[in-house]
Amino acid sequence: MTKQKVAILGPGSWGTALSQVLNDNGHDVRLWGNIPDQIEEINTKHTNRHYFKDIVLDKNITATLDLGQALSDVDAVLFVVPTKVTRLVARQVAAILDHKVVVMHASKGLEPETHERLSTILEEEIPAHFRSEVVVVSGPSHAEETIVRDITLITAASKDIEAAKYVQSLFSNHYFRLYTNTDVIGVETAGALKNIIAVGAGALHGLGYGDNAKAAVITRGLAEITRLGVKLGADPLTYSGLSGVGDLIVTGTSVHSRNWRAGAALGRGEKLEDIERNMGMVIEGIATTKVAYEIAQDLGVYMPITTAIYKSIYEGADIKESILGMMSNEFRSENEWH
């Protein structure tokens, strides 16, 4: 692939890690953010120490506070901003874009107010004549590992397979590999909903439960993610892939996962507001729990783990009692899909 110009919107941990992947591939990378000290640090010290204390970025990776500068003459735009501001940033991008670009996102969540997937938001806010079909970049990927060039395999999903193949070529190298998929619904719901299950798995750890319990919540969590996804129109096979079970494993078992760490802290009895303040990063699984619970209620989808986490976070229920309460639920077949 010839050298491409890519704007990455959101210089958080994942946006920064992906900027390095693209830079390693010889592309021109521009990070955009709205925190002056962070932008200055990236440009002058070539570090982003809030997320990576010991990593020095290549000097070719630049950052700017000016969205117009970031978008000038780019071939592709990657959204890696928190779910709750995706629509706002997309509107700002739409007001500036003056040429067609490949639009990608690598965030994992559902919009709280509308319950919409992020690709839908981008499609609504950015005119079709200025963008490709949206490409979703998702899968089992800790930024802490990608930034040190550990082997990582993820998915590029789009309704337009050629757009997905473009992104596959853009990112893939000797340590970072993408597989294409056309099931955007499946990939996005898997990426968003696994954060809820990671909170549950972390809570079990914080409560002192062992591997049996954690394996159970991850496995049954995959079942309820799949139930809801299929109801929304996803291909069930997607949940057996990198963006499904792969992402669920990496997020539901690792201390690198902010959702797992948040769940562990909840299990230890810490207050949510203290957890969010101490972590200093967005915990997408908290907001997604509410959205998923509301969707499940509307569609009549059985999601006991999501319900237990929802009641603990939003209704003040004791998290241990909520989780143990699932042990007395109605007997079911393992393969029920409703």
UniProtKB/Swiss-Prot annotation:
It is found in: Cytoplasm. GO terms for cellular component: cytosol. NADPH binds at S13, W14, K108, A143, R258, V282, E284. It holds the Pfam family NAD_Gly3P_dh_C. The keyword ATP-binding does not apply. One of its GO terms (molecular function) is NAD binding. It catalyses: sn-glycerol 3-phosphate + NAD(+) = dihydroxyacetone phosphate + NADH + H(+); sn-glycerol 3-phosphate + NADP(+) = dihydroxyacetone phosphate + NADPH + H(+). Belongs to the NAD-dependent glycerol-3-phosphate dehydrogenase family. Catalyzes the reduction of the glycolytic intermediate dihydroxyacetone phosphate (DHAP) to sn-glycerol 3-phosphate (G3P), the key precursor for phospholipid synthesis. This is Glycerol-3-phosphate dehydrogenase [NAD(P)+]. It comes from Streptococcus pyogenes serotype M1. The gene is gpsA.
